[in-house]
A protein has these predicted regions:
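Loop/turn elements at helix/coil->beta-strand transitions in domains of secreted/extracellular proteins
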Residues: 41-43, 72-74, 101-105, 248-253, ...
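Extended hydrophobic/aromatic segments used for targeting, binding, or gating
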Residues: 230-306
Length: 335
């Protein structure tokens, strides 16, 4: 039994990290293949939330990129994680560096709702302790509200690796055995080889279905915009992530992904003012370009007001690739 547990621990933490955190691990494995297939192209790692996961479809960029002889096109890869605000973005970047990836550009998603960290909006509460690696401990100590308790839980997880990860393992080995209401693989089961998570396959939109999604989301986000402010924890994590990317030699940009007319109407004037002032502060303090794609897409492509449909992701990415190239005209390929 001890040998079985020890073997499981090695697999979960080292040999097959996608077993512990398949959402990140599967993307990391896919990224290695894409880099091997496209040597010399400058790597652009895009990190963010489910909006990034479903919105950035690099295959669409591959179909239209210039592929000129005098300049290597950016190699876009989607390293988003569902629920990701600045802290999870920092976690993803730290993991990518620990796994040996050295992006030429890192694009961080900027989204005001995930810049709140107070009360129910505390981002670490969205991170399941079972998906944390030993290398995540510094992040836990810096940003979690009770790091000692989280570390204790991580140690317990490693003493009982099969039991504590049984649901996640089952979701990967036999997902159909899980009832739909308890499926865990929605964030990774459909990932393609470029890190894209296909969203709702709906365009043109079905008015009744789209209206129902908007009605479900509206009270949630109106609540997040009430008494809105950018939390110091989110600001610290975002600035640390930008600094880390630059320390490792990458250029950095921020991206504000598309929102529908309805979603923007849920944002109070005060929340809008504070978010725009904060974005301007980041642009000035950090000297970063901002790819403002907030108004790029017709409402019909946004199935719930803020997530792109599959068709919308393709249209968006065909425009996003050139925007990245324009933001970094000096970007060249590796020798």
């Amino acid at each position: 039994v001890l040998v079985i547990h020890a073997t499981a621990l090695v697999l979960l933490d080292s040999a097959l990290p996608q077993l512990r955190d398949p959402e990140y691990g599967r993307r990391a494995a896919a990224l290695r293949h894409r880099i091997a297939e496209h040597p010399g192209r400058p790597l652009v790692l895009v990190v963010g939330s489910s909006r990034t996961c479903m919105g950035l479809n690099p295959t669409a960029w591959e179909g239209v990129r210039p592929n000129g002889p005098d300049r290597a096109d950016p190699l876009l890869f989607n390293m988003g994680l569902v629920g990701g605000g600045p802290i999870i973005e920092l976690m993803a970047l730290r993991r990518a560096h620990a796994d040996g990836f050295r992006p030429d550009v890192v694009v961080f998603e900027f989204w005001p709702p995930f810049l709140r960290e107070d009360g129910p909006f505390h981002e670490p509460a969205r991170i399941d302790h079972n998906r944390l690696f030993k290398g995540d401990v510094p992040l836990v100590r810096s940003y979690f509200s009770d790091p000692a308790a989280t570390e204790a839980q991580m140690r317990y997880d490693r003493l009982h690796p099969l039991y504590e990860t049984r649901h996640r393992l089952l979701a990967q080995l036999a997902p159909r055995w899980q009832p739909w209401s308890r499926r865990m693989d929605l964030a990774w089961g459909g990932l393609d080889g470029w890190g894209w998570l296909p969203g709702v396959d709906e365009y043109p939109p079905k008015p009744v279905d789209r209206a129902a999604r908007l009605a479900h989301c509206e009270p949630i986000y109106r609540g997040q915009f009430a008494d809105y402010s950018v939390h110091p924890l989110a600001d610290r994590a975002l600035r640390e992530a930008v600094g880390l990317a630059r320390d490792k030699g990458a250029k950095v940009a921020l991206a504000y992904l598309p929102e529908s007319t309805e979603f923007r109407s849920w944002m109070t004037p005060e929340a809008e003012r504070r978010a725009q002032e904060y974005l301007a502060t980041l642009r000035r303090d950090l000297n970063v370009p901002v790819i403002d794609a907030r108004l790029w897409m017709d409402d019909g492509y946004l199935v719930d007001g803020f997530h792109l449909s599959r068709q919308g992701s393709a249209e968006f990415t065909r425009r996003f690739g050139p925007a990245v190239a324009a933001a970094f005209p000096e970007l060249g390929g590796r020798p």
